[in-house]
Amino acid sequence: MKKSRSVMTVMADDNVKDYFECSLSKSYSSSSNTLGIDLWRGRRCCSGNLQLPPLSQRQSERARTPEGDGISRPTTLPLTTLPSIAITTVSQECFDVENGPSPGRSPLDPQASSSAGLVLHATFPGHSQRRESFLYRSDSDYDLSPKAMSRNSSLPSEQHGDDLIVTPFAQVLASLRSVRNNFTILTNLHGTSNKRSPAASQPPVSRVNPQEESYQKLAMETLEELDWCLDQLETIQTYRSVSEMASNKFKRMLNRELTHLSEMSRSGNQVSEYISNTFLDKQNDVEIPSPTQKDREKKKKQQLMTQISGVKKLMHSSSLNNTSISRFGVNTENEDHLAKELEDLNKWGLNIFNVAGYSHNRPLTCIMYAIFQERDLLKTFRISSDTFITYMMTLEDHYHSDVAYHNSLHAADVAQSTHVLLSTPALDAVFTDLEILAAIFAAAIHDVDHPGVSNQFLINTNSELALMYNDESVLENHHLAVGFKLLQEEHCDIFMNLTKKQRQTLRKMVIDMVLATDMSKHMSLLADLKTMVETKKVTSSGVLLLDNYTDRIQVLRNMVHCADLSNPTKSLELYRQWTDRIMEEFFQQGDKERERGMEISPMCDKHTASVEKSQVGFIDYIVHPLWETWADLVQPDAQDILDTLEDNRNWYQSMIPQSPSPPLDEQNRDCQGLMEKFQFELTLDEEDSEGPEKEGEGHSYFSSTKTLCVIDPENRDSLGETDIDIATEDKSPVDT
C-alpha cells in the first residue's frame, strides 16, 4: 500500500451575494447555499464562509458572560451536501521530507513535481446537530487589556462555509481582509493582485456615494477594524510563535471552564484538578525531599545515568527464520479467529482485546506485522520478516504486563488507530512511505517501559529518570531512548537498509511525534494545528500546503496524539474497558502515594474519584476540542468519530450518580462560611460600582461568585436556622 504525494481540491459554488448590500444589512457577507446563522452566539457549521459579527457587538461581549446567552454549549447546524475531493497523485520521489518540493514551481501548479494541499471548500458534510467544544465560546470575558478585545468568529471568505475562526492570528488576517474589501468599496477601486483577490472569488462591488449615510457607517466600521488589528499586532511578542497566541487563549478559556467545574461539587473539583495538572503545561514549584545519607550511599552504587534503564537482554531470534514465521507473526492455535478479527485492520474500532486473546497476548507484534504487510513496508524498506518479528517481540517484552493501561495492548491500539488515520481519504496519498513508517513506528514505541505512574509522580519522588531528563517530558524521553536502544540488540535493527539520510530523518520525525504524546503539551499541539488550519482558511487560496517539514510534522504529531486519545471515540464496549484500565492504573498510583505519605494525585484516590464525571470532563475539555479540530482538517472523514464521541459522552453523563442533598445542619454551616468567605469580595464589587476604576488603582481579587444568604426579616424569629435561601450569581473571574 504505497502512498504518494497529492494535491487535494474541492470545487465550491460561485453563487456569491452582493458584498456591499450584505455589509449594510448584516455587517458580513454570505455566499452560495449557506444557511444564515447567529454566529457570534456560538453556532457554526463544519465548513463554509468565514463570518464576522459587527465590531460593536463583539465589543459588547466584554460585559457579557458566556452563560448570559442562555446557551450552555454551542451546536452545529445540519447540512446536506457532501464535498467532492479530487486527488492528483504525484511521484513521491520528487519530494524531500525536510526540504519540501522542487524549487521554481507553485504547489498549486498542476505540473508541480510535488506538494500536498488541503483545500477547504463551501460544500458541507451532512450530519446531525452536534455540540461544539468550549473553544467556540466567547473569550471576551477573559481579556483585561483594552488591546485584547477578542472575537469568537471570523470574516467573509468566498471559499469557505460558515466557520468560526477562534485563533487570534487567523482573526487578524481575516479582519485585515475585511478592511481591504471595505477599502475597495469606499474608494471604488478594484484590486489587481491575483494573490489577494482572485477574480473567480471577487464579489461584485456597488458604487458608493460618499455623501450617503451608509458610506460613513462603513468607513467608521473599517477604521474600527483596522484599529483592532493594530492593537492585536502591538501585543504580539516577536520571540514567540503566532500559534502561542492561540495556546494562551485556549488555556485561559479552559481555566475558566475548570473554575466553574470545580465550584460545582467536590468531585468536580477533583476532575478539574486532574485535567489542569495533566493537560496544562504548568511549571509548578515541586517540593523534592532532601535525600538522606543512606539514599546518597545507595545512589553511588547504582549504575551510571548515561546507561538507559529498563533495557533487558532477551533472545527471540534463535528460533525465528523466514520459513518458521507464522501467518500473523505470532504462534497461535486460534489462527482462524485471529484472521477474522484482523479483517477490521483498516477500520476504526478494531477490537484489540480480541486480538490479544487470540495471539497469546502478543497484540503489538501481531498488529504491527499485519500493518507492515498491508502497507508493503517490509518490501519497501527491505526489512526481513525475522528481523522485524525479533524486534517487535523484544519491544513488546519491554512493555510491562502488570501495568493496567500503558502496556502493549495500548501501544497496539494506538498503532492501529494511526494506521487508519493515515488512510483517511483526505490524507490517503499525502505522506511519503518514510513518513508513514515513522508514524507507525512512533506509535508502537511511544509508551515502552512505562512504569504505570505519571511524570509528576516521578518528579515528586526524585526518580532517576526525572533527574536524567531534567523533569522535562520524563517518560516520553525514556520511551524514545528504549525504543531506539532496542534497535541495537542482536537481529533487531529493522532500519539497517535505510540510507543515512533516511535514518536521520526518520529518527527526527519519531522523536517529534513521541514527545508530542506528553499530555502536558496538549494545548500547544491543539493551538498549533488550529492556527495552521484557520490561517489557511482566511487566505485567498484557502489551501493548506504541506510543503515543508514543519507543517507536515505538525499534522503527524497531532495524528499520533489523536490516536493516543482515541479511546472515547471507539465503541462504548471498548471505551468502557479502556476506562476501567486507566482508572485501575490511577488507583495503583494513588495507593503508592498513600503508602509514601504523599498527597494523592487527582483522580488517583479510589475512595473519592468520580469515574463517570471524570470521563465527561475529559471529553468536554480535552478529547472533543482535539478531535473537532482534526475533523476540520480532514472533513468529512471524521464525522462518524465525532458522532460516536458524543454518544459516549452522553452515556457517561447519564451514568453520573445523583448526589443526595446534604444534611440541613451542613447547609447552615456552608451558608455561614460562604458569607464569611465572600464578604471581602462583595465590598470590592460595591467599590467598583461607584465609578470607573482609576488608572493605576485596580483591585486584584479571585472570587467568581457572589453568594448571599437571604433571611426574611419579618419572619426571622419564627424561622429556624434551616430556613435560609442561598442566591448565587455567577461573575467572571478577574486575573491580574
Swiss-Prot record:
Transmembrane segments: none annotated. Zn(2+) 2 binds at D447. Binds 2 divalent metal cations per subunit. Site 1 may preferentially bind zinc ions. Pathway: Purine metabolism; 3',5'-cyclic AMP degradation; AMP from 3',5'-cyclic AMP: step 1/1. 3',5'-cyclic AMP binds at H406, Q615, F618. InterPro entries: HD/PDEase_dom (IPR003607), PDE4_UCR (IPR040844), PDEase (IPR023088), PDEase_catalytic_dom (IPR002073), PDEase_catalytic_dom_sf (IPR036971), PDEase_CS (IPR023174). SMART domains: HDc. Keywords: cAMP, Cell membrane, Cytoplasm, Hydrolase, Membrane, Metal-binding, Phosphoprotein, Zinc. Mn(2+) binds at D447. It comes from the Eukaryota. Residues 330-659 form the PDEase domain. Expressed in brain, heart, lung and skeletal muscle. Expressed in white blood cells. The active site is at H406 (proton donor). It catalyses: 3',5'-cyclic AMP + H2O = AMP + H(+). Inhibited by rolipram. Zn(2+) 1 binds at H410, H446, D447, D564. Hydrolyzes the second messenger cAMP, which is a key regulator of many important physiological processes. May be involved in mediating central nervous system effects of therapeutic agents ranging from antidepressants to antiasthmatic and anti-inflammatory agents. One of its GO terms (biological process) is negative regulation of relaxation of cardiac muscle. It comes from Homo sapiens. This is 3',5'-cyclic-AMP phosphodiesterase 4B. The keyword Iron-sulfur does not apply. AMP binds at H406, H410, D447, D564, Q615, F618. Its EC number is 3.1.4.53.
